């Protein structure tokens, strides 16, 4: 089995820094669920993106991410995190 790493964009880290600890814990637990096989959570493939972006729903938050592969390491790159109404703009 490949090793799985999680990387965050600057935008995602900035959003997490503004949340309370409980909310950050919920989001990080959901992102950790992506490392399972099969991934756990309400996941849908996003249309209109050729890089294979997917979205994970956690309550009213949406986590936009994509999978990247580097030799024996699978990377889950978290592109953005935001509220349902603002994340798709």
Tell me what each language-model feature is.
Residues 1-3, 18, 45:
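Basic nucleic-acid-binding interfaces
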Residues 1-10, 22-25, 56-61, 66-89:
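Enriched for short, Lys/Arg-rich terminal
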Residues 15-22:
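Surface-exposed, Lys/Arg-rich phosphate-binding patches that contact polyanionic backbones
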Residues 23-27, 38-40:
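Glycine/serine-rich loop-strand microenvironments at binding/catalytic pocket rims
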Residues 28, 36, 75:
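A short beta-strand-loop micro-motif that forms or neighbors metal/cofactor-
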Residues 32-55:
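A short, surface-exposed loop/turn module that caps and links secondary-structure elements
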């Amino acid at each position: 089995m490949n090793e799985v790493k999680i990387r965050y964009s600057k935008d995602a880290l900035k959003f997490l820094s503004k949340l309370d600890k409980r909310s950050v814990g919920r989001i990080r637990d959901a992102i950790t669920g992506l490392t399972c096989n099969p991934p756990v959570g309400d996941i849908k493939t996003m249309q209109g993106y050729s890089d294979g972006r997917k979205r994970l729903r956690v309550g009213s938050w949406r986590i936009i991410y994509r999978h990247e592969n580097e030799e024996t390491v699978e990377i889950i790159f978290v592109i953005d995190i935001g509220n349902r109404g603002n994340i798709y703009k």
